[in-house]
Amino acid sequence: MKKLNIIYEDKEILVVNKPAKLLTVATDKEEIRTLYHEVREYLHKKNQKVFVVHRLDKDTSGLVLFAKNPRLKEMLQNNWLRYTREYVAVVEGKLPKEKDTLRFYLQEDKTHRVYVSNKGLSSVTEYEVLDTNKTQSLIKVRIKTGRKNQIRASLAYIGNPIVGDKKYEAKINSLSRLGLHANRLVIKHPITNKEMEFLCDAPTQFYLGFEKYKK
């Protein structure tokens, strides 16, 4: 088992930095090679259990929060939309505005691809441009909802797919991975009610791939 990159741990919660290309939880095709399995093995040695609060896409890296009992899991999930969830992303092209809020209804097709529709579930995604190079933009993203592939589908719809995202027709793969990383999470601790901020910078290759294309 690979060593977990633990950002924070106490008696109630655990925050881990998930690497890209690792599932958060099991699927029909893969049950073992998941972050959940690694965390469960780690906590089993301490006679503790683990409960999934949320998940990241397989190709997205960054902060994932786990609870250590079902009551805490429910408390965290009930307040999830109140928490601050921020990402850093590298997208193709220049954004239409330096800062904007994208409000779309999202649906999922039979191939599990999410797309913008007049029906579907409402989503709210905020972005702010941090830097640009000749072909891409580095942006900060904050989500107000928690729809599947929300960031990826919304940015692709406005013509700025995340680099490396073949599922949403990205043509650039400058990072040799999906250009999306969950770098900031602010919650209220379910027991102490204290506000807690967790930070986790993207891997070096994330920024090196972007800088390579600057003038």
Annotated model-derived regions:
Residues M1-K215:
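RNA pseudouridine synthases
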